[in-house]
Amino acid sequence: MLNISKKNIIFFILFFLIISLILFNWKYFSLVNKENLESLKYEKIIKKINKKKSKNLYEVENFIVQNTSIYGTLTALSLAKKYVECNNLDKALLQLNNSLKYTKEENLKNLLKINIAKIQIQKNENNKAMNILETIQNHNWKNIIEHMKGDIFININNKKEAIKSWKKSLFIEDSNASKEIINMKLNELKEQN
């Protein structure tokens, strides 16, 4: 009797291990397939954004609404860029603001906020742009924020604050191309005086 129960115990242990492995593999592969499917949908949607037909944009907007993942946020950024290129700033702002509501990743939020502020500067909504820039607390974005603040101050004709912000940005900036742009702006202001 003891011999039969040992065989039964071994059988049940092996049965349990096999079932566990099957369930684990099934769960793992279903997650991988789901992520691959989202990735493929994202690639397909981005191709539609890059086409010039505007009827594709409705499908893109639906994709963004249905996907509150990183794919939805990245798609919203691409769609907003397309709207800005078509000078449809209100629709671009709408896409970015909607994505900002559900995005959890801090750097993506900051990227959305910077793009929102850029559009608001284009629309001469300088106070709104300044307010949204003030909400970005991460010091890694400080050079971009100060550069944009300088642009805002120029728009409201506050040259002293513009110079101050651009100099802060110049001090923090690592990119030589950005430094050249800031220096050009500073030199242009000096020539005007």
Swiss-Prot record:
Keywords, in A-Z order: Cell inner membrane, Cell membrane, Chaperone, Membrane, Transmembrane, Transmembrane helix
A single Gene Ontology CC term: plasma membrane
Bilayer disposition of the protein: Single-pass type II membrane protein
Coiled-coil segments on the chain, per record: none
Pfam hit, one: TPR_21
Cytoplasmic side: 1-8
GO molecular function, one term: protein-containing complex binding
Protein name: Ancillary SecYEG translocon subunit
InterPro entries per record: SecYEG/CpoB_TPR, TPR-like_helical_dom_sf, YfgM
Location(s) in or outside the cell: Cell inner membrane
Organism: Buchnera aphidicola subsp. Acyrthosiphon pisum (strain APS)
Upper taxonomic lineage: Bacteria, Pseudomonadati, Pseudomonadota, Gammaproteobacteria, Enterobacterales
Quaternary assembly: Interacts with the SecYEG translocon. Forms a complex with PpiD.
